[in-house]
Amino acid sequence: MNFMKNLTRGIIRENPTFVLVLGMCPTLAVTTSAINGMGMGLATMLVLIGSNVAISALRKVIPDNIRIPAFVVVIASFVTIVGMLMKAYVPALDAALGIFIPLIVVNCIILARAEAFAFSNGIADSFADAVGMGLGFTLALTILGSIREILGAGSIFGFSLFGAAYEPVLLMILPPGAFLTLGLLIGLINWKTKKA
């Protein structure tokens, strides 16, 4: 398969959040700010890259009847590594994301890419697919977190945009704000793609 096609597919055409609507639990829960969205996206991308490459490399030795438990073990190993690195180097982000880092193990984006792509493709294509899907997920979470942070706190990446006079829309940093923002973004993307 074409390396660049695999790389770019997950960013726009098959974006995990806006098109495939996968990974909704972390998407809705951690995107209260741009940095949280970006951090969760990057952590997921690292796990996705590691697990896709490992599963692709091991695909000929993993028996078909135990492939899902094998995928979970591989994914859990990479989640543990990423979790330990986050605790060591970005403890504030790790604390903000909390339980959602360990829950990457059962994130349907990672399991779906392992099952649908990495288990039946070579290492280079699996790497490209993981990077593309990971970038698409990171981009989606960062956009969602940015919109919610701007409207809900009047800041972006922690920097104040509007000063003390700004009246934040508190709904935007609460769960209903996540649903509202995600729904509007998905609707906008669907409208734009249907129009094109």
From Swiss-Prot:
GO biological process: electron transport chain
Broadest EC class assigned to this enzyme: translocase
Transmembrane helix is among the record's keywords: yes
Disulfide bonds: none
CC terms in the record's Gene Ontology section: plasma membrane
Keywords, alphabetical: Cell membrane, Electron transport, Membrane, NAD, Translocase, Transmembrane, Transmembrane helix, Transport
Known catalytic reactions: 2 reduced [2Fe-2S]-[ferredoxin] + Na(+)(in) + NAD(+) + H(+) = 2 oxidized [2Fe-2S]-[ferredoxin] + Na(+)(out) + NADH
Transmembrane segment boundaries: 38-58, 68-88, 92-112, 127-147, 169-189
Subcellular location, record wording: Cell membrane
Membrane topology per record: Multi-pass membrane protein
Highest taxon of the lineage: Bacteria
E.C. designation(s): 7.2.1.2
Record text on subunit structure and interactions: The complex is composed of six subunits: RnfA, RnfB, RnfC, RnfD, RnfE and RnfG.
PANTHER family reported for this sequence: ELECTRON TRANSPORT COMPLEX PROTEIN RNFE (PTHR30586), ION-TRANSLOCATING OXIDOREDUCTASE COMPLEX SUBUNIT E (PTHR30586:SF0)
Similarity comment: Belongs to the NqrDE/RnfAE family.
Chain's role: Part of a membrane-bound complex that couples electron transfer with translocation of ions across the membrane. Couples electron transfer from reduced ferredoxin to NAD(+) with electrogenic movement of Na(+) out of the cell. Involved in caffeate respiration.
Protein name: Na(+)-translocating ferredoxin:NAD(+) oxidoreductase complex subunit E
Taxonomic source organism: Acetobacterium woodii (strain ATCC 29683 / DSM 1030 / JCM 2381 / KCTC 1655 / WB1)
Phylogenetic lineage: Bacteria, Bacillati, Bacillota, Clostridia, Eubacteriales
